[in-house]
């Protein structure tokens, strides 16, 4: 759920869409949610248009949209454009755009996105961004939850059926199992942050986790398919 292509700060070079597709092709991952980094880094409208245009010929990739939370006055137009294009997922880049959970622009973007039934792909610390999203019926996938912070997420997930976390940073020996056995497999989705991280550790952790085959399938594909429906 967290595939990017294009330039990225602190990364040694641009990674083209073609290269990302090659990496996925040579991995166990058969499909992904992706977007161009032009949207969060330079121009949200142009970036969304680029993502839709580029991914139109990539059947294994589903487009993700974004908006610039620093310019929430234009967010409504951007979200309407994404909805018209059938985009279900909105990725927020609060770190790159210096957006705190209490900022007016952030609150406005979230309000507009939830009103349109969009799924938030959310960066940052869930301990900070999760509580303001509780009690709102939100579908949120937290992308940056570290294994050390898992207990706080589990407490929120007990109350929020729409809160999910990716496997990417759940590096503890039983992190995947803790999520599945504590709150259910529906709260976990596969994530690797291709191409900026090696995809192998995430796939191996999921493959050998002590969970049932049905739970493994839900984490790998089923939960995202449900969000797409």
Positions of the model-derived regions?
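Conserved, mostly hydrophobic/aromatic
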Residues: 2, 24, 51, 55, ...
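A general structural detector for well-ordered alpha-helical segments in enzyme core domains, enriched
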Residues: 19-23, 47-54, 78-82, 105-109, ...
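Active-site environment of divalent metal-dependent phosphoester hydrolases
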Residues: 6-9, 39-43, 70-73, 97-98, ...
């Amino acid at each position: 759920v967290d595939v990017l292509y294009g330039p990225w700060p602190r990364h040694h070079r641009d990674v083209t869409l073609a290269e990302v597709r090659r990496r996925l092709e040579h991995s166990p991952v058969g499909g992904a949610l992706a977007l161009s980094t032009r949207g969060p880094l330079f121009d949200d409208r142009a970036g969304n248009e680029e993502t839709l245009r580029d991914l139109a010929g990539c059947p294994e990739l589903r487009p993700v949209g974004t908006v610039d939370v620093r310019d929430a006055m234009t967010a409504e137009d951007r979200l309407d454009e994404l909805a018209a294009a059938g985009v279900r997922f909105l990725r927020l880049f609060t770190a790159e755009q210096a957006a705190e959970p209490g900022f007016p622009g952030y609150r406005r973007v979230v309000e507009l996105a939830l009103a349109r039934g969009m799924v938030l792909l959310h960066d940052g610390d869930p301990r900070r961004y999760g509580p303001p999203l509780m009690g709102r019926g939100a579908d949120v996938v937290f992308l940056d939850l570290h294994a050390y912070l898992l207990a706080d997420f589990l407490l929120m997930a007990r109350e929020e059926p729409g809160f999910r976390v990716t496997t990417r940073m759940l590096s503890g020996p039983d992190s995947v199992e803790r999520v599945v056995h504590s709150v259910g497999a529906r709260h976990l989705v596969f994530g690797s942050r291709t191409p900026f991280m090696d995809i192998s550790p995430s796939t191996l952790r999921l493959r050998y986790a002590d969970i049932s085959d049905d739970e493994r399938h839900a984490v790998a594909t089923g939960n995202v398919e449900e969000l797409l429906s």
